Amino acid sequence: AIERICRIKEIDPRKNNLSIICYDLSSISEYAKVDNNIFKLMKHNLPGPFTFILNGTNRLPKIFRNRKEVGIRMPDNNIIREIARLLDAPIMTTTLPYEEHEDLEYMTDPELIDEKFGDIVDLVIDGGIGGIEPSTVVKCTDDELEIIRQGKGWLEEV
């Protein structure tokens, strides 16, 4: 499935940053190394619009095995988190492919997403109109936190 998504996006999964969505904080610790301070920070800010870059564990999906780091998300979206819970597995995530000349509605409207991608994906879930602002990316692999990209989320330190 991951390789199929990468073909659709025309990206190399070994070279591009991919993230996984986890259901809850306990499932995050299966796939990433989380110390007490980072755990408290994540507990305070998640679920929410953040991607935390953490050191990975050996339980990561195969496509991530040669990487030291992994992006972890726990979005404030009950649909995707419930799917991850029911699967009892993380879900790989990436942004939709977007070209500058395209209307942004094709990134946010489930009906338009289905119109554009319905022939090449198995399923489009209509969870309502989505937002276009990206997640805030926080690197937590060193001793100090680093905001790699300021997006929708404003990190509240504990």
Stretch-by-stretch model annotation:
Residues 1-158:
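Active-site-adjacent structural elements in enzyme catalytic cores
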